[in-house]
Amino acid sequence: GTVDDIDDDFEDVLGEMSPENRTITIRLLQIFEEIIEEKQTEEAEVLKIYKQIELDNVPDAIDRVNWQGSAVDVAGQIMSTLILKHALPNANHRTSISMAQWYLESLQTGFSFPEFATADYEWKEWVDEYIVESKRILTVRRNTRAFLMLSEWGCDIVKRKDDIDIELSEYNLDLSTSEAFKYYGDIHTELCTEFVKETVKRAGYDELLGIDGVEKSDFVSYLQAEE
């Protein structure tokens, strides 16, 4: 699996996208492929993973971003919408964080993210706190009605995969499915924006907290120039 292979596999889907969305989507795929290669995934597993990619979800995620905000707000939105749309079968958080990094780097301030992972490819503790809470929010967002019922039956904690506990009393569960998607989507975006802000501070680029972001067209031009 190479980037060329990916482009061939998804040629029809990519062809239906706007030029700007196509450029961003191709970069997302390149980031994803690099992550898969870093993990030295077996070839058979790689092919299986590629077949599970829901590429047509990416433009919808991109179109939900308000490109008029501050740099950290836009980066947080990019990260959040890509995670929420879950276009990739795995590595959604790593890939979405990397895309937010590309966006902040497009401001050309010299900014680069601090290291997020340890040598054995585990999240550093401060990063893991955000990732775990993100996964909790994603799970609650999809299951408010079921979790409300469990809570009424006396259940206090739900355990999801990755051994993550969800304390039901900490979340508003009395929401319809559509209300939950909007409510927890907004909370997830706030979480991702806080993550981006902490990242910028840890990297020593506090000035990024107070500057406007770049327009979508400028971001796309940056990606094209870096190809």
Annotate each language-model stretch with its function.
Residues 1-227:
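FIC/Doc superfamily catalytic core
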